[in-house]
Regions:
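Bacterial N-terminal signal peptides
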Residues: 1-9
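Outer-envelope beta-barrel architecture signal
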Residues: 75-77, 131-133, 172, 190-194, ...
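Catalytic-domain carbohydrate-binding cleft regions of carbohydrate-active enzymes
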Residues: 176, 193-195, 253, 272, ...
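Structural preference for beta-rich elements and adjacent junctions enriched in aromatics
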Residues: 15-363, 369-370
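Residue-level marker for the onset of beta-strands and adjacent loop->beta junctions
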Residues: 22, 64-66, 161, 259-261, ...
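Surface-exposed extracellular loop regions of Gram-negative outer-membrane beta-barrel proteins
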Residues: 235-274, 363-418, 540-552, 568-588, ...
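A short local loop/turn or secondary-structure capping micro-motif enriched for an aromatic residue
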Residues: 34, 43-44, 86-90, 143, ...
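Exposed, low-structure sequence patches enriched in small/polar residues
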Residues: 333, 341, 411-668
Length: 668
């Protein structure tokens, strides 16, 4: 069977439609446009025009036309959009802070909560997410960028690019100016081709359209191409950017001053070194784990700038199988850290990271990826953690790869761990199929006893078997129902000695209405060893894609680990007055006693660079008194120059800590 599948991979072609893989020729700008959000007459005479956007869901021309323009010179790339709209009053723009995600879905949400325009560049033609540069703007001129590899939030590092937008009687216009030095691109070449796409999301109709149709599956190898670019002739000069900081903390017991520095050295246009000495994480608000029952350790998103910088170059491991091989939250405080990442060649990517806590712990991560083609890749991963006090030297090495032909995919990984209480291995093989309405995955898995990684997140060990996931979804352009999806996910595994481990599965259904209601339900029934999990979940949300007016409730009831179980999760996200955002999320679990969690977050926007915010975290465990941790903060950041932070309290404490912190970050 495996040989038959591999034969299919060698014979099947990649999906393509007439509106995919479009090509436009690069042109130099002789008339420099004024970036004011108004496309003036004869302001873009040299720019190449891109039109004929496609609705990704229907595959037909978008209902409202969009035009894009692109040109360049020795210093900048210039991009403009003209987005026509029959109902200009229906253009939605809400976010005002730079690098807002225009998203209704939190850390993993898609851009779906307001109108936006976006240009996507793939300078290495790799068709890999980690190599893409995305620049988007909403109708309030709020910029949002996702630079290749991942960047932290400081403007000096995230790129000093500009964008402006203006509503018109015919819709809205947008203009962008992107410095070459913001981009990673192949150096030493006289002519380049970039992967290119233009995207528009129209909130009123919920239509996402693209110039080069990548289909609902977002196949990146179907992006367009911007050809015959002549990059800047001036030879690249390595540049060094320094961000020293000073942090003063005043407590009842006294005060202290802490200093440190972050540095970013751009070796070439496609390779970067970042280092930090005495980093400060005390002022970074960490994400909070939910109190809901989970048989595996919960994944918590990373928010610390050092680990966000270049994060995509270290990504390895299947999130939905064994877990991520590098889980940066494993690394706590350290004294010095350094990372180097980027392209060795257009097809070879390297990431290296080390963090040293003198006298205690040293962590090292290495990730290498080779792009065989736009749809195929192979990679190596290595991780080592040396903890002196435990004499523990934990390591992991892994080989992984992926192939795709048309709508069929194959992913695999081989993992071997070593160290104290760890010496197991793991392997998985994942076959997938996806088209406009279906996604199916069949995974074969084998995890040995004692597989462990001090820097990774392994959900389970000592099992072998398979799991299946199937999703069927539809989206409609007319009628009361906007979208519908069904998920089915059976799983059958055994321990390595052959005794049953997990057997069962689940079924989920979700409806989204035209009026922005979301209704969902799911049923799960599993046996874990001799324990039964049997639950039913109900969810309802009003304003599902509008975080400024959203109310929801989730209820899970049934049985977990042979015990009666009930979980309530209310959430409210609201903007009661202009510039004031409030978010409440709760979790109440009845499972051999009550566990309660309440999180209230507030943020008042004084300007695009100044905010006042805070959070109150209340947690209660069975038989213990509740802990309450409030803190408030003032932040002046988001643009070039000195940043100022003032905090009362400690964001990541369990209970309130009476202290004041003042932090200044200087750009050099």
């Amino acid at each position: 069977m495996l040989f038959a599948v591999l034969a299919l991979f060698t014979t099947a072609g990649n999906a393509d439609t007439g509106d995919s893989n479009r090509v436009i020729k690069a042109t130099r700008a002789t008339v420099l446009p004024v970036i004011d959000g108004r496309i003036g007459e004869n302001e873009w005479p040299d720019a190449t025009r891109a039109s004929g956007f496609t609705d990704l869901v229907t595959g037909k021309p978008a209902l409202e036309p969009t035009e894009a323009y692109i040109s360049y010179d020795e210093t900048f790339l210039y991009v403009a959009f003209k987005a026509y709209d029959k109902v200009p009053t229906g253009i939605i723009a809400r976010e005002v802070l730079r690098d807002s995600r225009y998203s209704g879905g939190g850390d993993f949400g898609d851009n779906d909560s307001e109108d936006y325009l976006e240009v996507t560049l793939d300078p290495f033609l790799s068709a890999k997410q980690s190599d893409l540069c995305r620049f988007s703007v909403n109708a309030l001129s709020t910029r949002s960028a996702k630079i290749s590899g991942g960047r932290a939030g400081k403007a000096e590092w995230n790129g000093d690019w500009d964008a402006k937008a203006t509503k018109t009687s015919a819709g809205w216009d947008a203009e962008m100016r992107i410095p070459w030095k913001t981009l990673s691109f192949p150096g030493g070449k006289k002519n380049l081709d970039f992967g290119l796409n233009f995207t528009r999301f129209q909130y009123r109709t919920r239509i996402k359209s693209q110039w080069s149709n990548t289909t609902p599956q977002q196949f990146l190898n179907l992006m367009g191409r911007w050809s015959q670019i002549e990059p800047p002739k001036e030879k690249h000069k390595p540049s060094l950017s320094l961000l020293p900081y000073a942090l003063t903390t005043a407590k009842e017991t006294g005060s202290q001053i802490r200093t440190g520095i972050d540095a970013r050295y751009t070796v070439t246009p496609d390779f970067t070194i970042v280092s930090t000495i005495n980093p400060d994480f005390a002022t970074v608000e960490s994400a909070v784990q939910t109190v809901a029952f989970s048989r595996a350790e919960q994944f918590v998103p990373e928010r610390r700038p050092f680990f966000l910088e270049g994060a995509n170059y270290f990504s390895a491991g299947s999130f939905y199988t064994f877990g991520p091989l590098f889980y940066s939250n494993r690394i706590g405080l350290f004294d010095i850290g350094a990372k180097a990442y980027g392209k060795l060649t257009p097809k070879d990517t390297l990431g290296f990271l080390t963090a040293i806590d003198f006298g205690d712990r040293v962590d090292t991560i290495v990730r290498y990826r080779h792009d065989i083609s736009a749809t195929d890749q192979i990679g190596l991963f290595a991780s080592q953690s040396d903890v002196a006090k435990d004499n523990d030297h934990s390591g992991v090495v892994a080989l992984d790869g992926s192939l795709r032909r048309n709508k069929v995919g194959l992913d695999y990984q081989l993992i071997k761990s070593s160290g104290l209480n760890g010496g197991g291995g793991a392997a998985d093989l994942n076959f997938s199929y996806q088209d406009s309405f279906n996604f199916t995955s069949v995974q074969l898995m084998n995890a040995g006893r004692n597989i462990r990684s001090a820097n990774g997140l392994f959900y389970f060990d000592d099992f072998k078997g398979f799991q299946v996931y199937h999703n069927w979804s539809r989206e409609w352009r007319k009628g009361a129902w906007r979208s519908f999806s069904v998920d089915f996910f059976p799983s059958y595994t055994w321990h390595q000695d052959g005794t049953p481990y997990q057997r069962g599965g689940g079924l989920g259904v979700q409806f989204d209405t035209r009026s922005d209601w979301r209704l969902s339900t799911s049923v799960n029934h599993n046996m874990f060893d001799a324990q039964k999990d049997a639950t039913i979940r109900f969810g309802i949300t009003s304003g599902a894609t509008n975080r400024f007016r959203q109310i929801g409730m989730e209820l899970i009831t049934g049985q977990q680990a042979d015990k009666a179980y009930r979980f309530y999760a209310p959430n409210v996200s609201w903007r009661p007055i202009k510039n004031l955002d409030l978010l409440y999320t709760g979790g109440l679990q009845q499972f051999g006693g009550w566990r309660r969690q309440h999180i209230l977050t507030g943020n008042f926007i004084l300007s695009r660079t100044r905010t006042i915010g805070g959070r109150i975290l209340v947690q209660e465990e069975p038989g213990s008194p509740a802990t309450i941790n409030p803190y408030i903060s003032y932040r002046e950041a988001g643009e070039r120059g000195t940043e100022t932070y003032l905090l009362l309290g400690a964001p990541n404490n369990k209970s309130f800590l009476p202290q004041v912190m003042v932090k200044l970050v200087f750009a050099r």
